[in-house]
UniProtKB/Swiss-Prot annotation:
Function statement: May be a cell surface adhesion protein.
Family: Belongs to the fasciclin-like AGP family.
Protein name in the entry: Fasciclin-like arabinogalactan protein 11
Organism ancestry: Eukaryota, Viridiplantae, Streptophyta, Embryophyta, Tracheophyta
Organism of this sequence: Arabidopsis thaliana
Residue numbers with lipid attached (GPI-anchor amidated serine): S219
Gene name of the record: FLA11
SUPFAM superfamilies: FAS1 domain
Residues bearing attached sugar chains per UniProt: N36, N68, N141, N150
Assigned GO CC terms: plasma membrane; side of membrane
Length: 246
């Protein structure tokens, strides 16, 4: 009997000890920290140059703030690979002002979350954080056929290679070209205007040349007339001298 009671009390002691230990433990760690665009790209790899641009323009901080805001509608980011940046003409980025670099990054960000299937039903041009495409400065058009999504900007055409990351707030897609907006790069790809026939391209210089030509011609005329007068005077003097001898 005593042995049975001892066994029961021992079990009760162990039971309460386990409960006390369980409730006394620190809570399990919560989910990972807030969404961080650069951390996502670093984990994916091959986006070093885009990450550098995000950080130098502080666009990464703005994106992270928007993603973790309760009023956010989500974001869509088109991330060019390092190969895409390396294929740019030398000095392309260095020729941009700080404000233009910010706009270039913003042109790669849509202010809403768009999943891959939704690309088939979007209305063009899409609005980016750089501005409204309706004004013709930052147009971004999407065409989708099956699993292939193509992007055109009026300057370059790019293809969405794959989905890098997606959740309820953010979608990141890998693109094979840097998306160059028309507002900043349109003139660099537009063909040079062909010269008009008849030399009308240099009308301004031609009119200027006419003025210059008139003054030159009049000077020549003056010089020619002056020389002609000297020759006449000389001939007359010789004739007069001859008549005296005769």
């Amino acid at each position: 009997m005593a042995t049975s009671r001892t066994f029961i009390f021992s079990n009760l002691f162990i039971f309460f000890l386990v409960i006390a230990t369980t409730y006394g433990q620190a809570p399990a760690p919560g989910p990972s920290g807030p969404t961080n665009i650069t951390a996502i790209l670093e984990k994916a790899g091959q986006f070093t140059l885009f990450i550098r641009l995000l950080k130098s323009t502080q666009a990464s901080d703005q994106i992270n703030t928007q993603l973790n805001s309760s009023s956010s509608n989500g974001l869509t980011v088109f991330a060019p690979t390092d190969n895409a940046f390396n294929s740019l003409k030398s000095g392309t980025l260095n020729s941009l002002s700080d404000q233009q670099k910010v706009q270039l990054v913003q042109f790669h960000v849509l202010p809403t979350l768009i999943t891959m299937p939704q690309f088939q039903t979007v209305s063009n041009p899409l609005r980016t954080q750089a501005g409204d495409g309706q004004n013709g400065k930052f147009p971004l058009n999407i065409t989708s056929s099956g699993n292939q999504v193509n992007i055109t900007t009026g300057v370059v055409s790019a293809t969405v290679a794959n989905s890098v990351y997606s959740d309820k707030q953010l979608a990141v897609y890998q693109v094979d070209q840097v998306l160059l907006p028309l507002a900043m790069f349109g003139s660099s790809v537009a063909p040079a205007p062909a010269p008009e026939k008849g030399g009308s391209v240099s009308k301004g210089s031609a009119s200027g040349g006419d003025d210059g030509g008139d003054s030159t011609d009049s000077s020549d005329a003056e010089r020619t007339g002056f020389g002609f007068g000297i020759r006449i005077t000389t001939v007359a003097a010789i004739a007069a001298s001859s008549s005296l001898w005769i």
